[in-house]
From Swiss-Prot:
Protein name as it appears in the record: Ponticulin-like protein B
Function of the protein: Binds F-actin and nucleates actin assembly.
Maturation-removed propeptide residues: 118-145
GPI-like-anchor amidated serine lipid sites: S117
Biased composition (Low complexity): 108-126
Organism: Dictyostelium discoideum (Social amoeba)
Region (Disordered), start-end ranges: 107-126
Factors inducing expression: Up-regulated in cells that are either actively phagocytosing bacteria or in cells that have been cultured under conditions that promote the generation of cells that are competent to fuse with the opposite mating type during sexual reproduction.
Name of the gene encoding the protein in the UniProt record: ponB
GO cellular component, one term: side of membrane
Residue positions the entry lists as glycosylated: N34
Modifications made to the protein after synthesis: The GPI-like-anchor contains a phosphoceramide group, rather than a phosphatidyl group.
Length: 145
């Protein structure tokens, strides 16, 4: 019985970690934007996106979906528009958010996305957090069995 619990726990760890990885940042192109600048995924931190455009990005339970909150002030207190949930597209395909074109940068340590030569090699803090939470939750459930 202990062997089965251990095996299930190991499989849940592998599943949680493999599903927690996804994207580490974004490239934004449009008026006042530098299309070569990578905006790293910093969970909920106010960041400069383009000239006079700031934003917060928060991950969701799906590693390819994010909530975007655009602001017009450097303190991220005055919203430009309502929060939008966006889905990163595979193979570095860009998508539109209002007048901006966004390209998600995949995590090169992830097998669930296509590698990119411009991708950073670090693991996303948000992905690590999601994976840790998923693992701890599954471990607690298996401990109760």
């Amino acid at each position: 019985m202990l062997f089965i619990k251990s095996l299930l726990l190991l499989l849940s760890l592998i599943f949680a970690v493999s599903n927690a990885t996804g994207y580490v940042g974004f490239k934004v192109d449009g008026p006042g934007c530098n299309a070569t600048k990578i905006i790293t995924l910093e969970n909920g931190a106010c960041q400069t996106v383009c000239t006079n455009l700031y934003g917060k990005v928060t991950p969701t339970n799906d590693p390819s979906k994010f909530n975007l909150n655009p602001f017009i002030d450097v303190d991220c207190k005055t919203p430009l528009m309502a929060e939008q949930q966006v889905t990163c597209l595979p193979d570095n395909k860009p998508f539109k958010v209002s007048t901006l074109t966004v390209t998600c940068i995949p995590d090169t340590t992830s097998s669930s996305t296509s590698p990119s030569s411009t991708s950073p090699s670090s693991t996303s803090p948000a992905s690590t957090l999601i994976g840790s939470i998923a693992f701890v939750t599954l471990a607690a459930l298996f401990a109760l069995i």
